[in-house]
Each structure stands twice: as C-alpha cells, then as structure tokens.
From Swiss-Prot:
Its EC number is 2.3.2.27. A zinc finger (RING-type) spans 321-372. E3 ubiquitin-protein ligase that mediates ubiquitination of ACC synthases (ACS). Negatively regulates ethylene biosynthesis probably via ubiquitin-dependent degradation of ACS4 and ACS7 enzymes. Regulates lateral root formation and development by controlling ethylene production which inhibits lateral root formation at high concentration. It comes from Arabidopsis thaliana (Mouse-ear cress). This is E3 ubiquitin-protein ligase XBAT32. Keywords: ANK repeat, Developmental protein, Metal-binding, Repeat, Transferase, Ubl conjugation pathway, Zinc, Zinc-finger. Disruption phenotype: Delay in development and flowering. Deficiency in lateral root formation. The keyword Metal-binding applies.
Amino acid sequence: MRFLSLVGNSFGCSASGERLVSAARDGDLQEAKALLDYNPRLARYSTFGVRNSPLHYSAAQGHHEIVSLLVESGVDINLRNYRGQTALMQACQHGHWEVVLILILFGANIHRSDYLNGGTALHLAALNGHPRCIRILLSEYIPSVPNCWSLLKNKKTSVAGFDSSVLHEVINRAADGGITPLHVAALNGHIETVQLLLDLGASVTQVTVEDGTTIDLIGAGSTALHYASCGGNTQCCQLLISKGACLAAVNSNGWTPMMVARSWHRNWLEEILNPTTEQPQLHLPNVPSPFLCLPLMSIVNIAQECGWRENDCLTPCRDPCAVCLERKCTVAADGCAHEFCTNCALYLSTTSITSSKTSNVTPGSVPCPLCRNGIVSFTKLPHTTATTRTSTSSRTSISLSFCTCSSDVLDTALLTNPHYSCKPVVSRTGSRTPQSARSSAFRSLSCRRFPPSLCLGGSDVDEPRSRLIGGSYSRSGVGFRRSTSQVEGKRSWFSALNHCVTTGGSAC
C-alpha cells in the first residue's frame, strides 16, 4: 500500500508535466512559456517508462525556440532517456541543425554514447546523412585558419594550435562492433556525409570487430568500402577508392568488397570493385566539402562568451547589422571587415555553402553577403563584452512544488542532489513540523525507497561519461555496462538502423 500511494502521488503530479510534453512536441511556444512561468521545475519532467523529457521531444521535432526555453529554465542538457539518448542525439538523428547549434552553444556533450549500440550523436548524424549537423558537432576541433584545408589534407599532427590527432580520434570513434560514422554513412550512400568525414580525417582502413554484442551481417574486419559495397552507391565506392581504400581487403568471412557487392546483388559495382582488372582513372575534383565552413569555430567561441540572443537597443550613432537590421553589430569578418551581429554570423557560418571552385578564395571560407569575399574567421568588436548569465537555480520557483512526496514545499537543497531522500516535512510557513504533529498519512509518503529523480527527470545512477583527457578517451569507473544477454543490446548498427538494405541477401 505504501508503494501504491507513492505511485499514485507521482501520477497525480504529472498533469502539468504532460501538458509541457505536448507543448514541446507540438511546438506550442506560448503554452510552454506559460507552464514554465507557472512552475520552472516542469522542465525537468520526464515521461513514465521511456523517460523522454520535454527537451527530448522538442529536439526531435526541431522546435529550437522551445529547446532554448527549456535549457534556460534549468533542465539538464545531457539528460538521457531509457535508451541512453540525449536531446543532442535525437536532434542529430532527425537533422535539426538549428537545435544542434543551440545545444552546442549551451555546452552539450557530443561524446556521450547510447545504451543499445554505443553510438554517439556523430554516428546518428552520419547514419541519416546530415553533414551540417556533423560540422556543427565538430566546431570545437576545426580551427578558423586560412591553411586549415591544407592541414587536413597533409594530416600534420600539430600546426598553429591545431592537433589533428584529437580530431582523428573523435571522428573515428567506434560504436559497438567497431562501427565508425564513416561505416554507416557509406552503407546508406550519403555521399556528402562521406566526403565531409573523409575531408576531416576519417580512416578508410579502420575495420569492424567482433565484440560479442553485435550481429554483423557483413562480417567483422570490414572496412568502409565493404559497407559501401553492401549499400550499392557507386559514388561512395569511387570516393573511398580515391582516398586509398583497398580493393583486396578481406574480412573475417573471407569476403572482399566485390564479394560483398555480389552477395547483396549490387552487380553494377563489380567493374569498379574488381581488384584484378585495371581500374579506370577517377577524375574526382580535389576540392573540400561544401560543409567545411571554416568560420564556425571562431563565431561559436564568441557566441558562447558574449551571447547571441540579446536584442540590445541600438544607440543613435551606431548602425545596425546589415543583414537583420535589428541588432547591433558585435563581430567583424576578417579580411573585408564587414560587421554583423552574432546571430547573423552564426546563421551565415552554418547555412552558407563554402567556396571551393574560385582560385582566389580560401577553400572552406564562406562568402560575405555584402562583398562576396571569402570569410575565414570572425573577431569580436571592441565594444562587445562577455555576458553574465543568470543562474537557473535563482529562477526556480520555490513556491510551487512539483512531484514532491507531500503537498508541501520542496526544499531547495534537494534540487541540487539527484540522490536525495525526503527530509522532514516542511510546513507552508517554512518551519519544520514537529515529529509528534505529523500525521501518519504524511509519514506513509516517505520516499526513501522511491527515487524522486524518476519524477524530476534526473538519473538515479551515475551515467557514463566519455571525456577527452590528454588526447584519449577515458570512461568513468561507474560506467554503464551493456548486457550481452539482452536482445536489443545485440542489434548492430547494421541490423537495427539501416534503412536501405534488406536482410535477405545470399552469401557468397
């Protein structure tokens, strides 16, 4: 009876949370604002069972304004659902680059992996063919320097503050079974994604492994060319071959890429995958991906330091941004020195196709909307100052309780500890109620055995974190262990997430 009373109480407190979930899913910004003004703690609500928060729903649907509202209301930006996915992962899965950009600006962790396949946000973006999301995810690793394209091509280890080994480790991080972002992009035939990954240092020689947790229908020891051969995209195969992919590579099944193509009835690939015949000369243009976007690191750093959403009043002696005509100019483009607001510079850096065909333009630069000269980086203007953000805890309403175990006020100290247990009941006047005066009904609602984080959207265990330490990844000792006995845990990226390949192919 004690447990049933707890469950009933938590369900009774969920009506407002479900309204916020509906508003986040449907993109109702006014409803979401009204609910959060009434109770800011609703941002930490998570649905029963799947544990999706309003942040997950708004990110999956691409409602970037609601995402900003929820993050500013104090929700954990790296909150996971039952599959271990964060809001950043779901935004990358559906290709909502605006949401990805906002989450990156607020400091979302790009290295977290899910519980089923060990894939990161980078894997999901590559799987579904979203190169713009990939470029935003890697904005902290690609410098805004004129010679960046040559550094990436020559694969120099450390030049001008750029450490290619760190970028190489991030972009070639493997999920369960050794699956890299290049594997899943090549499998699904996303040529633009494959080109961007190769330009940023993705390895064509990295192979999958047999780790006992995945079922690989192609075979362990497969390269990205094996996966491209299974997918059947001619351009992907040609691009991988031009970057040095080996036609004679053999996986654990003894299959070459040509044999994989035959087993999946991709007969049109045999001519270019046959290692014994003379390969035709491939005349692929030696130009960077149109999504390279060199200015991205510089403007993201400025936005994180000085803000990007402030609509400051313009002084009479200062001209507005020439693009939006609403905000004051805060940054200037290196070279042409044209001034923009931070918001417009962010939009320009993420949506413009980079220049690559003009000989006098730096590869990877974006064209200036005023003079069409290439922009490699942005610098903040002298009057642009760092912003001081208001602490989200100070905005939390203490007068409105949410998902508490009694009808009284939740102690503010409990909000900072996800493993708290209920303290003695606090009266509405703020004084503690004597033990003798407490009713048995309130005593029966003690939640020491019922984690309040299930209502508040927090985690009741320490979640695994992948951190970049000294150029390598280390996982905390309290990491999540995937059970090899679970059916879902054994589904590989190939069998669980591939949308273009059926499982009815015959073996060689």
